[in-house]
UniProtKB/Swiss-Prot annotation:
Catalyzes the two-electron reduction of the C2 and C3(1) diene system of 15,16-dihydrobiliverdin. One of its GO terms (biological process) is phytochromobilin biosynthetic process. The keyword Oxidoreductase applies. This is Phycoerythrobilin:ferredoxin oxidoreductase. It is an enzyme of class 1 (oxidoreductase). Keywords: Oxidoreductase. It catalyses: (3Z)-phycoerythrobilin + oxidized 2[4Fe-4S]-[ferredoxin] = 15,16-dihydrobiliverdin + reduced 2[4Fe-4S]-[ferredoxin] + 2 H(+). Signal peptide: none annotated. Belongs to the HY2 family. It comes from Prochlorococcus marinus (strain NATL1A). One of its GO terms (molecular function) is cobalt ion binding. Its EC number is 1.3.7.3.
């Protein structure tokens, strides 16, 4: 039976979704602001499919949460559960381009071979110290504290480095009790601190000049194009929901700034 969600701020209904407490924390952080639902078509608010054998089909559910408000063009979270193991949270908070703010990005993925953890305040203009220095000064100590407690995720592809800060928290952790403990004791408090850092920057942000806004917009569009072109979830989404739906979802919902 399909769940009816009337708008993007309606609660996510996926039962036993691993990453629910992270989205709950995000919603709580926004609760002190005046927010509105972000316009998302019904076909992307809730999507259900099945995979596996005909004798033992497994359900996959994807729901999309989103909002907008002053200073924030779009905050959105793709929430997916496929079978008992595969679980995804892809959260991006995109500022309006007339504020000198980074993106907030959290990509948490559980697969049969482990958890992938990616957390950052991502720059629109990495080589511009007026855009980055005040962010990195706040974020680097937070990153140093938490990254020391988890294994590294490995090398970042060279073409992707311009879209990550030096405080990119990146890890691969195992399934089972060890991974569960790391998520509870390290990943969740790290996420909370990164989120608090972003909201501190958000509250302090002042409107920029038209010239600066144009520079930021170009940087944001470049970031969005890269994310859309290189989205690692594309293959998985296509296998669950088909090519046409997937390409529309990636380009018109997840990374929609043109």
């Amino acid at each position: 039976m399909q769940i009816i969600r009337n708008n993007s701020q309606d609660p996510i209904s996926i039962s036993n979704w691993r990453w629910a407490c992270f989205l709950d924390e995000t919603i709580k952080a926004f609760s002190t602001f005046q927010t509105r639902p972000y316009q998302i078509d019904n076909d992307f608010l809730f999507r259900e499919s099945f995979f596996g054998s005909s004798s033992n089909p497994k359900k996959v559910i994807l729901e999309t949460w989103g909002l907008k408000m002053e200073k924030i063009r779009q905050a959105r979270c793709a929430c997916l559960q496929a079978g008992e193991i595969t679980s995804v949270m892809n959260l991006v908070i995109s500022p309006l381009n007339n504020y000198d703010l980074p993106f907030f990005g959290a990509d948490f993925v559980t697969l049969p071979n482990g958890h992938l953890i990616a957390l950052d305040l991502q720059p629109a203009l990495k080589d511009d110290i007026n855009h980055t220095q005040h962010v990195w000064n706040k974020l680097k100590p937070i990153h140093a504290h938490w990254q020391s407690k988890i294994p590294t995720g490995g090398d970042i592809p060279s073409d992707a480095r311009q879209y990550f800060s030096p405080a990119f928290l990146w890890s691969r952790i195992p399934l089972g009790e060890e991974g569960d403990n790391l998520i509870t004791q390290t990943i969740k408090p790290a996420f909370d601190e990164y989120l608090n850092c972003f909201f501190d920057l958000l509250r302090d942000a002042k409107i920029t000049s038209k010239e600066r806004s144009f520079q930021l917009l170009n940087g944001q569009k470049k970031y969005m194009r890269y994310r859309a072109e290189k989205d690692p979830a594309r293959g998985m989404l296509r296998s669950f929901f088909g090519e046409v739906w997937t390409e529309s979802y990636i380009n018109n919902i997840l990374f929609d700034l043109k």
